[in-house]
A protein has these predicted regions:
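Short, intrinsically disordered/low-complexity patches at protein termini
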Residues: 16, 105-107, 177-179
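N-terminal targeting sequences that direct proteins away from the cytosol to non-cytosolic compartments
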Residues: 19-80, 92-95, 100, 114-115, ...
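Terminal, regulation- and interaction-focused segments at domain boundaries
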Residues: 40, 85-88
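Broad, structure-driven detector of short, well-ordered beta-strand segments within folded domains
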Residues: 82-84, 142-143
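Residue-level recognition of well-ordered beta-strand positions that form the cores
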Residues: 85, 157-159
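A general structural signal for short secondary-structure boundary/capping elements
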Residues: 87, 131, 178-181
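Signature of long, low-cysteine stretches enriched in small and polar/charged residues
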Residues: 102-155
Length: 182
């Protein structure tokens, strides 16, 4: 009796352990810890604009021959770059500049109806704009435009230097949204 119980238990154990069907494991991602926000004045003085810049961002001036006022802000530890472009405008060309910006935003999204827009207004400084947040697996989840409606138009687009995965990049996107709003 004892021996048959041992054989039955051993047989059941062998059946449970000898399973040959592969069970896939979920893919793991590294935890991304953005640094604490800290800001300084833009260290480039010959631009037609100024703003506060994260201490973690590196300013890259484009090669000679690119339009004046264009800069890139690189976050090497986050593998992200913010491409910024500047255009002198007139009140007559403001509408066209805004429409081009919106068209570029829509082109980046698979689902244009999911684009969220947040308006920005600082009447004391005469600065107005929009922040566009793209849902899903977009390579450029944040884009923005700023203008004084008279002579300056500034546009920025954030790009990841990796395959976008909105869930795993969400902490970085939140951090950079805070930097852009600052």
């Amino acid at each position: 009796m004892r021996m048959s119980t041992g054989i039955v238990c051993g047989g059941l154990l062998a059946l449970c352990v000898s399973c040959t069907e592969y069970t896939p494991k979920p893919r793991g991602y590294f935890r991304i810890e953005p640094p604490a926000p800290s800001y300084q004045a833009l260290p480039v003085g010959d631009l037609p604009y100024t703003f506060r810049l994260s201490r973690w961002a590196e300013v890259e001036l484009p090669p000679v021959g690119n339009p004046a006022g264009w800069i890139n802000l690189s976050y090497p530890q986050l593998n992200v770059k913010l491409y910024c472009s500047y255009f002198p405008i007139t009140p007559a060309t403001l509408g066209r500049a805004e429409e081009e910006c919106r068209a570029l935003v829509v082109r980046q999204s698979k689902y244009p109806e999911r684009i969220k827009m947040q308006a920005y207004s600082n009447p004391e400084a005469s600065v107005y704009g929009s922040l566009f947040m793209l849902d899903g697996e977009s390579a450029s989840p944040l884009q923005f435009m700023l203008t004084d409606s008279v002579s300056h138009f500034f546009r920025g687009a954030l790009y990841y230097d990796c395959i976008p995965n909105a869930d795993s990049l969400a902490p970085v996107t939140r951090y950079l949204k805070q930097d852009i709003v600052e």
